């Protein structure tokens, strides 16, 4: 039997429809190549710090409470993805980290020694100003991951015109 092209696939998710589509694509690939998946969610602490500085949190000193709520929300959403019928029979390791998403995704790709990153083409923060000044997370991951990156758009029926 030939050696599998991919042994381990990293799938970063922000729970947007596009990232959940990337997870579905990765599950199909995992079945095809008998591959393990690392499912990663990064709590964007840089955004939290900015919200705190701008006074956008209900209580500015409640950043720790907000992080706790975001971790809880992440665990619930990861569980929801893993309990889906399409995830049955695939070996999935879940990881929740804090930091700048593209940095943590690239670090995880290296530390987990993944062969491929499968991620949504765009996520929850797809505002045009953010992209103009900072570039998209997917674009930064393509430049820094150190392995191939497959970006997955929404399926045609889900795309907005």
Provide a role label for each language-model segment.
Residues 1-4, 80-117, 156-161:
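Structural beta-alpha unit
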């Amino acid at each position: 039997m030939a050696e599998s092209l991919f042994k381990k696939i990293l799938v970063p998710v922000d729970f947007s429809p596009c990232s959940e589509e990337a997870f579905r694509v990765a599950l199909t690939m995992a079945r095809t190549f008998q591959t393990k998946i690392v499912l990663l969610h990064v709590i964007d602490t840089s955004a939290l710090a900015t919200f705190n500085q701008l006074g956008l949190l209900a209580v500015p000193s409640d950043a720790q409470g907000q992080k706790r709520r975001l971790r809880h929300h992440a665990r619930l959403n990861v569980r929801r993805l893993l309990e889906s019928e399409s995830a049955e029979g695939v070996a999935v390791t879940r990881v929740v980290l804090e930091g700048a998403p593209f940095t943590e995704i690239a670090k995880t790709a290296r530390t987990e020694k993944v062969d491929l990153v499968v991620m949504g083409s765009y996520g929850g923060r797809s505002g045009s100003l953010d992209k103009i000044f900072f570039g998209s997370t997917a674009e930064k991951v393509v430049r820094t991951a150190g392995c191939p990156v497959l970006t997955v758009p929404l399926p045609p029926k889900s795309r907005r015109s």
